């Protein structure tokens, strides 16, 4: 049964969040009456208002108005005044993933999960399906540059969504195709143990219907181990691994583009199909891997090589994924969301592939608990940066933890052998260092999930002043 149009006003608490805003936008496009609130004005709130969606700034009981349904994310606390008011009025309170699941019932769906790479892979799947004329509906965890938004309503039969595993609610999503990019020990505050994370991803794949499939990256040992435990669902594997059903090889850089080949082997017939010299306008093996996942999905949906080739070549990227924010004296400045050691290592490796110059990495650790739990990994993930500048921890509402700090991370980086790791107290220290240390052809890469993105956009202007 599809969600009826008669459910009344749907109120989103935290409507400006990247996940919530996309769902609200698609609901509105489908003709539902949508409104919401957020703590602060942001670009997502502005965009929703421009589409005719009422968005309050600040949380208050009276914001609910005539709401009949309230949607919340896991970030909303039980003492939030709108949550309290909804409880008092006995309104249905719906989790973000549950509302996303309701939207997915309108279409056949591809859900992209994994610890890293979800947003980019979701965008790539959408790009290929677009190029193949399938006109998908898309709900993503990041702004897709070609759309200028994280969500769009398509006229086709398919929906492409990012499946956020952070609170376990991704298991509610009724996907026909489930993609897993990788599995690392993240969100242990919710799951309690890595074994429970593994089990959640197994269930994610086994939740697809018998006519669906899992698309899984066997370059990652945890995912390869999971493949052997999937007993009753069809699986297509991908990666650089020689055993992959959809395998990329011969990856190289040409004029800032990744160029690579893809070999597709059918399990039943052992037939082989090769696509040579595919071009992706972004660097990095991890991005080629994500593109291979998208190719695996597109191939399963019957798309031809020409459409795949066209979709990859035209891929416009995702905001905050190695996004160029400006240049100064031949120095390129990038903004990236990477805040986990695996992501940081992949981004810096991609930067190293893309330039023969020096790389200055500017990192803002995100959450004290993450820095504590992955301290050794953070101490070893900056090897591809010539200089590392570490800013104070972005707490994201957490309290400090004794002995866990950016200064401690810098000391650990130096102890592990990094030749130029420094602590910086804030953004005001960056421009003088870049002026002194950087030369034409160098990259400056900002890394983090906090407000460091504002620094990345401010630096080009500061350098020019």
Swiss-Prot record:
Compartments where located: Cytoplasm
Binding site for ATP: 114-120
GO MF, one annotated term: UDP-N-acetylmuramate-L-alanine ligase activity
Highest taxon listed in the record's lineage: Bacteria
Known catalytic reactions: UDP-N-acetyl-alpha-D-muramate + L-alanine + ATP = UDP-N-acetyl-alpha-D-muramoyl-L-alanine + ADP + phosphate + H(+)
EC nos: 6.3.2.8
Keywords, ordered alphabetically: ATP-binding, Cell cycle, Cell division, Cell shape, Cell wall biogenesis/degradation, Cytoplasm, Ligase, Nucleotide-binding, Peptidoglycan synthesis
GO cellular component, one term: cytoplasm
Pathway the protein takes part in: Cell wall biogenesis; peptidoglycan biosynthesis
GO biological process, one term: regulation of cell shape
Record function comment: Cell wall formation.
NCBIfam families in the cross-refs: murC
Family, similarity comment: Belongs to the MurCDEF family.
Protein name: UDP-N-acetylmuramate--L-alanine ligase
Organism field: Chelativorans sp. (strain BNC1)
Gene that encodes the chain: murC
């Amino acid at each position: 049964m599809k969600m009826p149009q008669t459910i009344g006003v749907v109120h989103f608490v935290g409507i400006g969040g990247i996940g919530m805003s996309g769902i609200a936008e698609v609901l509105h496009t489908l003709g539902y009456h949508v409104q919401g609130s957020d703590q602060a004005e942001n670009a997502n709130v502005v965009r929703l208002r421009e589409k005719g969606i009422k968005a309050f700034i600040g949380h208050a009981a009276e914001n609910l108005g005539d709401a009949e349904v309230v949607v919340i994310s896991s970030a909303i606390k039980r003492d939030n005044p709108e949550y309290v008011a909804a409880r008092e009025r006995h309104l249905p309170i719906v989790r973000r993933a549950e509302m996303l699941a309701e939207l997915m019932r309108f279409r056949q769906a591809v859900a992209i999960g994994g610890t890293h790479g979800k947003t980019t892979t979701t965008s790539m799947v959408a790009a290929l399906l677009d190029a193949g004329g399938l006109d998908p509906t898309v709900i993503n965890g990041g702004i897709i540059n070609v759309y200028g938004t994280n969500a769009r309503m398509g006229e086709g039969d398919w929906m492409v969504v990012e499946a956020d595993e952070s609170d376990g609610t991704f298991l509610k999503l009724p996907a026909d195709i489930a993609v897993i990019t990788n599995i690392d020990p993240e969100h242990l505050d919710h799951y309690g143990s890595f074994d429970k994370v593994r089990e959640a991803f197994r269930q994610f794949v086994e939740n697809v219907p018998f006519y669906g499939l899992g698309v899984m990256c066997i370059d990652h040992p945890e995912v390869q181990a999971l493949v052997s435990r999937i007993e009753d669902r069809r699986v297509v594997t991908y990666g650089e691994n020689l055993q992959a059903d959809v395998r990329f090889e011969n990856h190289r850089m040409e004029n800032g583009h990744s160029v690579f080949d893809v070999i597709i082997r059918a399990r039943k017939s052992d037939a082989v199909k090769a696509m040579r010299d595919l071009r992706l306008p972004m660097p990095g093996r991890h991005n080629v891997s994500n593109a291979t996942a998208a190719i695996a999905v597109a191939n399963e949906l019957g798309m031809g090589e020409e459409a795949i080739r066209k979709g990859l070549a035209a891929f416009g990227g995702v905001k905050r994924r190695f996004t160029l924010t400006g240049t100064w004296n031949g120095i390129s400045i990038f903004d990236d969301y990477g805040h986990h050691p695996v992501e940081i290592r992949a981004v810096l490796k991609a930067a190293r592939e893309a330039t023969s110059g020096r790389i200055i990495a500017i990192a803002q650790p995100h959450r004290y608990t993450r820095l504590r739990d992955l301290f050794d990994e953070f101490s070893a993930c900056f090897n591809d940066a010539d200089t590392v500048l570490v800013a104070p921890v972005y707490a994201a509402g957490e309290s400090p933890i004794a002995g866990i700090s950016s200064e401690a991370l810098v000391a650990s980086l130096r102890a592990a052998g990094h030749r130029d790791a420094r602590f910086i107290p804030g953004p005001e220290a960056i421009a003088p260092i870049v002026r002194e240390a950087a030369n034409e052809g160098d990259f400056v890469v900002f890394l983090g999930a906090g407000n460091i993105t504002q620094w990345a956009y401010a630096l080009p202007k500061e350098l020019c002043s």
